[in-house]
Amino acid sequence: MKYASNNIRNILIAGHAGSGKTTLTEALVYFSGAAERMGRVEDGTTISDFDPEEAKRKASLSASVVPVEYEGIKYNLIDAPGLFDFEAGEYEGIRAVESVLVCVSGRSGVTVGAEKAFQLARKNGKATMVFVSKCDLENANYFKILEDMKIRFGSTICPCVVPAKLDDGTPVYINLFSQKAFKYEGGKQIQVDLPDIGHRFRGLIEAMSEAIAETDDELMEKFFGGEPFTTEEIVEGMRKGVKDGLITPVFCGSAVNMQALDMLLFNMHKLLPSPEHEASTLAEDANGEPVELHCTEDEPTAAYVFKTVADPFVGKLSYLRVISGKVTAGEPLTNARTGEVEKITKPLTVLGKKQIENDGIGAGDIGAVAKLVSAKTGDTLCDADRVVKLPAPVFPKPSLFMAVTVAKKGDEGKISSALARLMEEDPTLCYINNAETHQQVIGGLGEQHLDVVKAKLKNKFGVEIGLEAPRIAYRESIRKACQKQGRHKKQTGGHGQFGDVIINFEPCDSEQVVFEEKVFGGSVPKNFFPAVEKGVRLAAEKGVLAGYPVVGLKATLLDGSYHPVDSSEMAFIMAAKLAYKAAMPEAGPVILEPIHTLKAHVPNDNTGDIMGDVTKRRGRVLGMEPDEDGLQTIIAEVPLAELANFTTFIRQTTQGRGWFTTEFARYETLPEMLVPAVVEQAKKLGNLDEAADD
């Protein structure tokens, strides 16, 4: 393969929306010479945001893999979206890299997106580095941001390059490793005299030296002895500290004006771990036993599918991170999940819209393969002689659900296949064909997410849809017992129809309809019992209030009569239905609504607001407990009908830090004051008409 694993750096570029991630990626591509011109987010011309929706919205919507080759090193940069609705990109990318570069805006400072990116990196054991962008802007405040990072990210923060200005206001950048300063003209580095930044300079050098000293006992002795470190000791100590999670180096510059990018690239090479530095990757063999994979081409192939692109015109493209071995054209690889064999087409290096064929993808490298049949995101492709499975990815679960309406008649059938294609490339999108409410429902991470799905369905698949709140699947039940007769008699010439039953209807704890018989003396022959039961069950599919299915109902056949000639199965089905319809209005009918268990994970400062809102939504707070990410988990029970806009509320209230899950708990009686609205809606939907027809 072209690049040995020790000359590869796999890096996720993450942070808040607008912090400069895509511009930095674009600048690094241009700086390396891989692009003739530098694109702009504002113009929709960047390499990583090549999707039409990204260009239109001027924001990244999915993770984009951008390979950069510079001075013999290959940097596989993964530009992740900063918008919370599209954070699946971060979760995809984190599985393919050893390092995370957190981008922080020199103007906006440390925002929630940067915090979440840093936490995701730490949770997944990745090396971290910070780049403070836009440092040449007038209102940038690097040192305030530095102090804020120490508070939010912890004591590992270690500045390595700091900004300053010459007397004429020209931005310069001080390299604390070499203790030299540089200005930039057209992206080219020019050394200048070290500007005076007061007492800060010695303090920064002292702090960096102490951080390096803590990585090695010999360096600690040298530090306390007052001896300066050599350049080699600084780099090696810093590299070790980064790998062990003891140091988070902070660099800065301006991507737009090509300032200090050379120092960033150089230190991404020197300080961030290569795939070779990973001791091993843990997987499971075919028997579920643990097995270690090593980053070498001498081992059998194991490659992880971390991203999928499904385009109706270009076809399916699977992005692979090769853990061991190598991926080459014509090689058969086994999908560990399905057992199917995939034949590998020519491996590709993808740069924006450009696809370049190559000889293969070596251990530790990232590339793409087209036209895989069974593979999806999270799958492991491996040598048939050593079938291994890497841990399945964990993605945020959909929290906002909307029903789909079709603008053009006849497009209903196209929706499911089009959504299936979109779900291949978006693990946080889900599709439910709800047979009970007769609606097609899609779920995502927020309003923007579903709006993009709507746009892609139209632009990629020619299906125009609308979105509306999904209907609630209510139930009906009764509160008291009622005994009624159902008598079906019909004479039409020849054989007639006759069935006569007396049934007692009462509430019960079962979620289903329970049927029993207590007939004495053969008033209803046993061979008609199943028909009576069938009639009750058919009738109970529609309640008398709003036409919703009835639950918690026990029907006991007590008595009746029959005709030796005219009685039939159908006659007793009809008799049971008549008894049901006569009894239900007098049995205290009620409408039941679904109650969900809500688990809201929010910062401690927001717990009061969230609990107050839950109460306003007719919810009951059951308790609160800390979670593993330092948030508080509020546990509550809330009617599903009240959770429609909770996704937006929790995100706005917590500034994007909070998230939640819900799970069906049970059905409860709908408050009397809300019944008329539900009944009125049922009339509009035709529920009651259908019930009457039965």
Each language-model region and where it sits:
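Structural and coupling elements of P-loop NTPases
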Residues: 1-694
